[in-house]
Amino acid sequence: MKYSDTRIYKLAKESQRLAQRVVPPYSSKFSKRTYTQDQHIAILCVRVKARQKLRDMEELLINMPDVQQVLGLSWVPDYSTMCRAMKRLRTKILSVLLYLTACVFPSQGKASIDATGFDKRHSSKHYVRRCKMILGSMKTTFIIDTDSLAILGVHMTVTRKHDTQIILPLFHKVLKSFRIRVLPADKGYDDQKVRDELRKFGVRPLIKHREYGSLDKAHNARMKKEDCGQRSKSETVNSVIKRKYDDTLHTRSYWNQCKEILLMAVVHNMEKGMNIVTVIYWRISTKLCFCKI
């Protein structure tokens, strides 16, 4: 297999192409113009895929001449350059990249929501205390499309916010870009205000009631198992992201940790999109196939 067929090579090429649609080549007119912004974003995406720290990326890129060539790097940026690029990168840009990667997939309006946690063990205890971070992990909530398993929206917090306080802001954010008809969720999102708000926008809430009495059991029995079972797909996406891209955040500042999670979501969607493109390519191929009968 050629190196150009590997997933890291394709990911670097695709992430740079998408970044060129979102950001200008240089962040300022006073820039030294050594590296472009799309090159920095592509390197950060490769870092997520390779599960490496920023300090180890310089050595990794030196051993990848094909990736250097496809990104147009005359020489590899050092650790401090990549740290500054990560710090300058705005979360709005990553949100636009997440939207562009999620638009590739056909959707029927079926979504699901669930929360998970990413460990912040690399953050110092003094920083955790000073910033009033109660949890030792970053609580992350994903809204996914149940047909394609693509991530539509992300919410991050380090405080003890309840699920019912997170679902509506994240839902309104996703609804600006995507159409949602059905939204299953677990009992942690059980709140009548949440149900009323979802119905106001034409969304059918499939949120099971906490069973305090016979009426709650009757409400849960009315829900179809096929529809409520789609909620487990959001747990599948949480598990896939943690296994493929690591469940530990290596950056220390809060905003860099948010960017790290957004980069994981962007890379997840891009890899899903590359699988679809590969399948379509093989389906429309005009090569003759001979088989023995």
What function would you assign to each model-found segment?
Residues K32-D38, K49-Q52, E59, M82-F201, ...:
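Polybasic low-complexity intrinsically disordered regions
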Residues K2-K49:
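Basic, short loop/linker segments at the boundary and entry of helix-turn-helix/winged-helix-like folds
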Residues Y26-R33, V70, M156, T251-S253:
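A short glycine/serine-rich beta->alpha loop
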Residues R55-L71:
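DNA-recognition alpha helix
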Residues N63-D66, V76-R84, G213:
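Short, conserved phosphate-binding/catalytic loop or strand-edge motifs used
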Residues E226-I293:
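Basic, amphipathic alpha-helical segments enriched in Lys/Arg and hydrophobic/aromatic residues
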Residues H162-I166, K217, T286:
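A short, polar/proline- and glycine-enriched secondary-structure boundary/capping micro-motif
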